[in-house]
């Protein structure tokens, strides 16, 4: 279920401070964060945010279509390497 509108979007305060600082200084350097649960707000448009996926920080360039989604949606945590090939087919 989506979050109630009267509560507003959730964003960690430490991330919000970093975003505000980057916007006022027009800094294009990626903002490193572990907060996958924070929602993308309109102030983040045009910034690059490096979201942690459990192993490394994945750079995510924020566009206007991403507003309202969570940062973690754009940094996958699992890598799919495909199913094992059929061993019977390889022997022939």
From Swiss-Prot:
The keyword Ribonucleoprotein belongs to this UniProt entry's keyword annotation: yes
Domain of life of the organism encoding this protein: Bacteria
Pfam families: Ribosomal_S19
Keywords recorded for this protein, A-Z: Ribonucleoprotein, Ribosomal protein, RNA-binding, rRNA-binding
Cellular component aspect of the GO annotation: cytoplasm; small ribosomal subunit
GO-annotated biological processes: ribosomal small subunit assembly; translation
NCBIfam families: rpsS_bact
Protein name: Small ribosomal subunit protein uS19
Designated gene of the protein: rpsS
């Amino acid at each position: 279920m989506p979050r109630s509108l009267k509560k507003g979007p959730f964003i960690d305060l430490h991330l919000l401070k970093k975003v505000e600082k980057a916007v006022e200084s027009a800094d294009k350097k990626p903002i490193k964060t572990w907060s996958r649960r924070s929602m993308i707000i309109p102030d983040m448009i045009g910034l690059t945010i490096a979201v942690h996926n459990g192993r490394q920080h994945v750079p995510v360039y924020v566009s206007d279509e991403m507003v309202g989604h969570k940062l973690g949606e754009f940094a996958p945590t699992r890598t799919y390497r495909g199913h094992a090939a059929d061993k019977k087919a390889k022997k022939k």
